[in-house]
Every structure is written in C-alpha cells, then in structure tokens.
C-alpha cells in the first residue's frame, strides 16, 4: 500500500513560479481556490469571544479634605538631591514650621571672625598662585600669609609742562 500511494508536492512548492508552468489545469484551479479562501474576509475574522469593556471604578468624594494633607510629589532624602529637598520644604505646609525650627537650632561651626581670618589667608595663597615668576622676587610674605610688594611697581610718568 505504501508503494501505491503517490507522494504529493507541498502547496508552497506548487505555488512557486517555475512549478506553475508544468501544472495541469486541474491542479491550477485547485491552487487558485485555496488562495481565494486564504485571502477572503472570513479568513481575517477572529473567532474570539467579544471582550467586555472594562468597567471604570470611580469613587466620588463630597469634600476635598482628603487632599489637604498630601505631600509634594518629588522627594529626596539625606541630601541626595538638594534642589528637590528645597522644593519639598517649600511645598509641604507641615514642614514649613519644622524647617523654621531647624534653621534656628543649627549651630554655627565657625565664627564670623575666624571665617574672615581664613578668607584673608586664602586670598593670599591664591594670589601667590597667579603671580608671575619675575614678580615673585619683588614680593614678600608676612607671617599672616599676606603678600606685600618690596619695591613699588614702576609706572609711566607723565611729562611735566
């Protein structure tokens, strides 16, 4: 029986252009009918059950009191984003009073006088960095770190009339 059964070529192979030249009229008609079935509108219709529209879940509140104690949406903690933390402090009404209390309790690590002295020495040391080589010999450093000129810098003198 297996030897009597003739093997058939696949439909995809028969649709190829070079295979259609040698086909007889009966097989050509059969292929055309199958192609029509595939292209027909019924082929593109999905046999799925109709989907029900999702019911929206809406809750109506009579008052807006629930929205009064909400926090500002953008958040930052432990100085991760300082700009956002500033916005948080401004926008959150509860934190305004707390922020004022925190500002009052902040201790000053460096006094104003000490900061002024540090700034003076800093100006001197940074000034040294930008002095040219030939001018370094003309300047003298005090014990405080300030730089003073040994000789006054020569300047252009106007001729007298």
Swiss-Prot record:
One Gene Ontology biological process: maturation of 5.8S rRNA
Cross-link (Glycyl lysine isopeptide (Lys-Gly) (interchain with G-Cter in SUMO2)): 37, 86, 128, 151, 154
Entry's localization field: Nucleus, Nucleolus; Cytoplasm
Motif Nuclear localization signal location, chain numbering: 117-134
One Gene Ontology cellular component annotation held by this UniProt entry: nucleolus
Positions carrying Phosphoserine: 111
Modification(s) after translation: Phosphorylated in M (mitotic) phase.
Keywords assigned by UniProt, alphabetized: Cytoplasm, Isopeptide bond, Nucleus, Phosphoprotein, RNA-binding, rRNA processing, Ubl conjugation
GO molecular function: RNA binding
Similarity comment: Belongs to the MPP6 family.
Listed PANTHER family: M-PHASE PHOSPHOPROTEIN 6 (PTHR13582:SF0)
The protein's role, per its UniProt record: RNA-binding protein that associates with the RNA exosome complex. Involved in the 3'-processing of the 7S pre-RNA to the mature 5.8S rRNA and plays a role in recruiting the RNA exosome complex to pre-rRNA; this function may include C1D.
Subunit structure: Associates with the RNA exosome complex, mediated by EXOSC3. Interacts with ARHGAP18. Interacts with exosome cofactors EXOSC10 and MTREX.
Protein name from the UniProt record: M-phase phosphoprotein 6
Native source species: Mus musculus (Mouse)
